[in-house]
Curated annotation (Swiss-Prot):
One of its GO terms (cellular component) is cytosol. The keyword Protein biosynthesis applies. (6S)-5,6,7,8-tetrahydrofolate binds at S109, L110, L111, P112. Its EC number is 2.1.2.9. Attaches a formyl group to the free amino group of methionyl-tRNA(fMet). The formyl group appears to play a dual role in the initiator identity of N-formylmethionyl-tRNA by promoting its recognition by IF2 and preventing the misappropriation of this tRNA by the elongation apparatus. This is Methionyl-tRNA formyltransferase. GO terms for molecular function: methionyl-tRNA formyltransferase activity. It comes from Clostridium beijerinckii (strain ATCC 51743 / NCIMB 8052). InterPro entries: Fmt, Formyl_trans_C, Formyl_trans_C_sf, Formyl_transf_N, Formyl_transf_N_sf, Formyl_transferase-like_C_sf, GART_AS, Met-tRNA-FMT_C. The lineage of its organism: Bacteria, Bacillati, Bacillota, Clostridia, Eubacteriales.
Length: 308
């Protein structure tokens, strides 16, 4: 079975590894190298790093739809499938029509819910109790193709986007193999998607500023959903305090939302519109993330300050 693989971030790496193990991967497409870090050195994508270990031809089109030479090369390869995992470019009908059986995309949501760029973040921000992966036969729409298989996982009360990402990253590779086998053997008939959806738009940093006039649970979900990026924050005495870990306490407070009502080694209690939020791990400017117990060992957090 000849496979062309298209993907870019670390989420796609286990799927690429599995494709290399099970099939004949004839080409890898990934996004161009990008400047990274303070030194702005050019960095390879995670998929390129993995592909180089296996001496598979790697192509990095700026825009695949405009790269005639590469499109012709893909046609010459005559792949049975093109497998797409977080590639970062939309495929034209011309490219979608190249493989014998079609293009399969692994998407990290239970479609049709959470189409779009940030499905894991939004599922947690919205307080969903489950998420998962869906494989689909791609069409020209954005995450609208006919569904092949789904794999559902529980979102536990304190799970972060990073933790959910790492679970689905590994499980997605298995789902792709089952999908490839099912489609190529004719054992699976893809199913059309319904219209009910929540569009998981790309995150921007503005969402990270905590509104204390929300319930403790809503804020807890925001903190989980924005970890590991961009990290929810609030202002403490004109200093930005990034918040990495919280817990909802079913307690009442008559203080204004955002007021620090108690500080102990267990955490910082903050009044919310509903219930109380316990802040357990924070980061201040020029510091590293610390538990509250670690932080108050050398610094003070005052009660009755209102977080902004």
């Amino acid at each position: 079975m000849n496979i062309v693989f298209m993907g870019t971030p670390d989420f796609a790496v286990p799927s690429l590894q599995r494709m290399i193990k099970e099939y004949n991967v004839t080409a890898i497409l990934t996004q161009p190298d990008k400047p990274k870090g303070r030194g702005k050195k050019m960095a390879y994508s995670a998929v390129k790093e993995e592909g180089l270990k296996h001496e598979i031809p790697i192509y990095q089109p700026i825009k695949l739809k405009d790269d005639r030479d590469l499109i012709e090369k893909l046609k010459e390869l005559k792949p049975d499938f093109i497998i797409v995992v977080a590639f970062g470019q939309i495929l034209t009908k011309e490219v979608l029509d190249i493989p014998k059986y079609g293009c399969i995309n692994l998407h990290a949501s239970l479609l049709p819910m959470y189409r779009g760029a940030a499905p894991l973040n939004w599922a947690i921000i919205n307080g969903e109790k489950s998420s998962g992966n869906t494989t689909m036969l791609m069409d020209v729409g954005l995450d609208t193709g006919d569904m092949i298989l789904k794999d559902e996982v529980e979102i536990t009360n304190n799970m972060t986007t990073g933790e959910l990402h790492d679970i689905l990253m590994v499980r997605g590779a298995d789902l792709l193999v089952k999908s490839i086998e099912g489609i190529s053997k004719g054992d699976i008939v893809p199913e059309k998607q319904g219209n009910e959806t929540f569009y998981a738009k790309m995150l921007d940093k503005n969402i990270a500023n905590i509104d204390w006039n929300k319930s403790a649970e809503e804020i807890h979900n925001l903190v989980r959903g924005l970890n590991p990026w961009p990290i929810a924050y609030t202002d403490y005495k004109n200093e930005r305090m990034k918040i990495y870990e919280t817990e909802v306490l079913k307690e009442k407070s008559n203080k204004e939302p955002g007021t620090i009502i108690d500080v102990s080694k267990n955490g910082v209690k903050v009044s919310c519109k509903e219930d109380v939020l316990l802040i357990k791990r924070v980061q201040f400017p020029n510091g590293k993330p610390l538990t509250i117990e670690q932080y108050i060992n050398g610094h003070e957090i005052e009660e009755n300050i209102i977080l902004q």
